[in-house]
Amino acid sequence: TLSVRGLASSKELQESTGKSQATVSRLLAQLSGRVLVLGQGRARRYGLAKSIRGLPAQQPLYWVDESGRFDKVGTLSLLSGDVLHVDLAGHTFVTKAALPWVLDPLRAQGFLGRLLAQHLSASGVESDLERWTLESILFAALHVQDAPGAIALGEPADPTPAGKVHVLPDLADDADNMAAALDQLSLNVAKTLPAGSSAGGEQPKLLARYADGTHVLVKFTPPRGTAFGERWHDLLHAECLALDTLRAHGIATATTKMVSSPTRTYLVSERFDRLGASGRRHLVSVGAAHTGFVADAYQNWTNTCAQLATQQQLSKDDASKAEAVWHFGRLIGNTDMHSGNLGLFVDSRTLVRPRFRIAPIYDMLPMRWRPDMVSGAADYSAFEPNTLSLQSAARHMAQVFWRALAESDTVSNGMREVAQIMVERT
C-alpha cells in the first residue's frame, strides 16, 4: 500500500489491508528502517522512504536570513509513489511529482539549469531538464550552493558525494579588468554550452560576485561580429534601457550595468534575492504563487496579481505595478513575459497564507527580435502595439523607452531605425 500511495495514516493502512491496528503497528515496526513516521498526533502519517539517487530520502531545509545565518526550519522527505512530504516552518506540504510552491526556486531551469544538468550527467541525471523526475530535481538541488531564494536543501557544511557546484568567481572593480575576467568566464561557459543554446534563442548566463561580495547574474552575447552576437548586443542594451526607464518612473528594477570588451557584451545585474556577501531573501515566481493560491488556470501576470490582491495576499499597489509593467512589456515587444519572469518576495512567517511583495523587475526587453535557429537574426521589423496597452498608463513609459533607444549610440542602425518607427506608433 505504501509503495503505491507513498503516505498513509494508520487507519488508512488498516482499511486497505484489512489488518488490525496491532498488526499494522507490528508490520510498521518491522519496516522501521524503510518507513518514515511523519507528523504528530492525529496528523501522523507513515511513508515509505525513497532515496534521492542514493542519497538519504530525508533532507534538512534551511532558511538563510538577511544576515546570512542558516536556520534549520524543516525536513523534506521523498516517498515511494513520487510523493513529497515537506515540514517547513511549522507547516506541512504534501505534493506528488512536484515541488510545493515555496520550494519552486530549488527547481533548476533555463540556461543555468542546463549547465547544471551537464555538470551532473556523470551521476546519471538526464541532460534534458524537461525529462527530470522529482528525484532528479531534488538530487540537483542538493548539489547547488547558490539556488535562487532563501531556502537551502541539505546540510550546508557537508557536500554531497558528487561535490557541490563551484564557488562563485569574483569580478574586479575596474571596467577593463572586469571585462577581461568576464571574457574568460564566458569562454569557459561557452565551451560547455548545451547543444543548440547559442543558436536557439536561449540567453547564455553566468553567476559571479563583485569584489565586495555583491552577487550578480551576468548575461552575455555570442562573439561580436557574428549575426547572433550583434543581435544580442542590441537586445542587452535595450534591456538595460528598459529597466532604466521603469526605474525612472518609480518602479523598482534589478540594478544593472553594461560591460563591453572587443569580443562580447555583458549585462551585469545585481541579484535582489541576495543581500551583501551572504544574506538572502526568499523569492518565488508569480507562476509558483499562482499554483499555490489561485484556483483558475494561469493566464498572465496581471490576472494572477489581481487575484492575489483580491485575496489580500498582495497589495493593490503592487498589483497595479504588475499590470503597468505587463502593458509596458507588450508595448516594447517583450513576447516572453512568462510565469517565471516576475518575482514575488515572501518570508518564512507567512507560508500558510503568505503576503507577497513584488520584487524588482528583470528580463524586460524586446524579445520579439531575439535570434533563433529557424529565422536566425531576422531583420528588424516594426509591429502594431496592442490597443489595450496603448490605453494604459504604461504608454508614456514605452514612448520614453522608444525615443531613448532611437537616439542611442550603443545599438545598431537597424535597431535605431525600428525604434524611431515605434516612437510614431506608440
Which residue stretches match the model-derived regions?
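Phosphate/dinucleotide-binding and metal-coordinating scaffold of catalytic cores
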Residues: S3-S339, G343-T426
